[in-house]
């Protein structure tokens, strides 16, 4: 099961030592830990979306996409940053996110 990151040290490790992949408006930073938990974080910058309603909607959409991921490798924690001033349709977000997961986060190498 994938849960939100609660540990501040893990977030710091992800941002300092993690690998980065980009595609379109998405940036995913991830790091492999030696535990069996998969954890995630989501960031939608306030400078792009002033309205909290829109930021929360985008975060809910990402949570829905992440919770439906079933093939994720154990021990991978990641942080998704949505870095675009335009809103994107859910289907496009889902496609971008899944392609990035297949590209790097899901791979077993």
Q: Over which residues does each language-model region extend?
A:
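Positively charged, solvent-exposed patches that mediate nucleic-acid binding
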Residues: 1-109
């Amino acid at each position: 099961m994938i849960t939100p990151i609660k540990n501040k040290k893990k977030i710091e490790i992800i941002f300092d030592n993690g690998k980065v992949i980009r595609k379109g408006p998405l940036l995913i930073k991830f790091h492999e830990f030696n535990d069996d938990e998969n954890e995630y974080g989501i960031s939608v910058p306030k400078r792009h979306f002033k309205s909290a309603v829109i930021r929360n909607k985008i975060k809910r959409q990402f949570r829905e996409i992440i919770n439906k991921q079933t093939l994720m490798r154990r021990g991978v924690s990641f942080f998704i940053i949505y870095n675009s001033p335009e809103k994107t349709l859910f289907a496009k977000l889902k496609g971008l996110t899944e392609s990035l997961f297949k590209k790097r986060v899901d791979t077993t190498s």
